[in-house]
């Protein structure tokens, strides 16, 4: 079963096992502002998404990462769709992303 929830302080070790870009002191902001999500497969964390606000108002996805063992199963697509629905429900009419291959 797949579940997606907000990141918590207790997810910090998992978070940094996948996210090598976020300064460690920023993690508390991600959790406090609810700008990070954890994807769980059968209760085990396997992916994450974080975002910031561009121009202080436009949601901008700054990282989407799925553990290597779970890639190719559509989990990234599900995580992105979850974020898009939530941002739309909050009134955002535009979202931004950036990719690196």
Feature map (PLM): residue ranges:
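Generic N-terminal initiation segments characterized by hydrophobic and/or small/turn-forming residues
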Residues: 15, 45, 77, 92-93
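Acetyl-CoA-dependent GNAT
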Residues: 2, 6-62, 67-68, 86
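Short, structured secondary-structure boundary patches
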Residues: 49, 72-74, 101
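Conserved GNAT acetyl-CoA-binding A-motif
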Residues: 87-100
């Amino acid at each position: 079963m797949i579940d997606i929830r907000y990141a918590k302080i207790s997810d910090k070790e998992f978070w940094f096992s996948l996210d090598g870009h976020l300064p460690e002191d920023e993690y508390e902001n991600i959790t406090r502002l609810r700008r990070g999500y954890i994807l769980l497969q059968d209760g085990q964390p396997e992916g994450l998404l974080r975002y910031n606000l561009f121009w202080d108002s436009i949601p901008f996805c700054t990282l989407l990462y799925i553990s290597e063992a779970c890639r190719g199963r559509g989990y990234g697509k599900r995580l992105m769709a979850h974020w898009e629905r939530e941002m739309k429900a909050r009134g955002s009419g535009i979202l931004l992303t950036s990719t690196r291959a």
